[in-house]
Design a protein with these regions (language model features):
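Intrinsically disordered, low-complexity regulatory segments
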Residues: 1-173
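Conserved small/polar residues in nucleotide/adenosyl-binding loops
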Residues: 174-181
C-alpha cells in the first residue's frame, strides 16, 4: 500500500546482511543495516529509510557491495565516487549525513553503486546523452564536489543515469574524423 504521491522506484535482491545507502535531492544520505528494515507482508507500507526535509525527495539507493563504490552525480554535471566506508552506519529513519553540498554545486540528480569496469550513461533534460567510463571519474570523500562528468548549460540539467557494462568503441574518434575529411585532420 502506497500513500498518495508515493511511488516505488527501486528494487534490489540482496542477501539480507548488507548496508544500504539512501540519498536525497537536497544532498543528504543515510547508511543503515539492511537488517534494520524488518520483513513485512507484500501489502504493507514498508519502513521509513530517511527523514526528508520539506520539499526534499529520494533520488536513489545503493547496496554496499565489496567491489563497488558510490557514484553521486549532480544536476550541474559534477560527479564523484566515494567509498562506502565514508558513510557512517546509522539507525534508519534519521536525517542522515551531508552527502553533497547542493547550495554550491547543484542538487543531486542520482546516486548509483558502480564498479571500475563499468560505464555510466547520463541524460540531460534537453536530451543530451553521454557515456563515461567509471574508471575516469575521480574518487573523493563526501561531501566533495567531484569532477565535471557532463557539461550542462544554465537551462539544462542532468536528470538520470544508468550503469552499464564497459564497451570499447567500435571506431576511434581520430579514425572517424580522418575518414570524414579524407585524411585531413581538423
Amino acid at each position: 500500500n502506497l500513500d498518495e504521491g508515493d511511488e516505488l522506484s527501486w528494487v534490489e535482491i540482496t542477501d539480507g546482511n548488507r548496508n544500504l545507502i539512501v540519498a536525497t535531492h537536497d544532498g543528504m544520505s543515510i547508511c543503515f543495516k539492511e537488517s534494520d528494515a524488518r520483513l513485512i507482508g507484500r501489502t504493507a507500507r514498508g519502513v521509513r529509510a530517511i527523514q526528508l526535509a520539506e520539499g526534499d525527495y529520494v533520488v536513489g539507493f545503493a547496496v554496499a557491495l565489496e567491489d563497488t563504490c558510490l557514484l553521486t552525480v549532480s544536476e550541474t554535471g559534477y560527479g564523484r565516487k566515494s567509498n562506502f566506508d565514508d558513510y557512517r552506519v546509522q539507525s534508519r529513519a534519521g536525517k542522515g549525513l551531508i552527502n553533497y553540498h547542493t547550495e554550491t554545486y547543484g542538487k543531486v540528480a542520482m546516486i548509483a553503486p558502480v564498479r571500475e569496469d563499468q560505464d555510466i550513461i547520463m541524460i540531460s533534460q534537453e536530451g543530451i546523452v553521454i557515456r563515461t567510463p567509471v574508471d575516469q571519474i575521480s574518487a573523493f570523500k563526501r561531501p566533495a564536489k567531484g569532477v565535471r562528468v557532463m557539461r550542462t548549460t544554465d537551462e539544462d540539467k542532468v536528470v538520470t543515469l544508468s550503469v552499464v557494462e564497459h564497451m570499447e568503441p567500435a571506431v576511434s574518434y581520430t579514425h572517424l574524423r580522418a575518414h570524414e575529411t579524407r585524411g585531413n585532420l581538423v
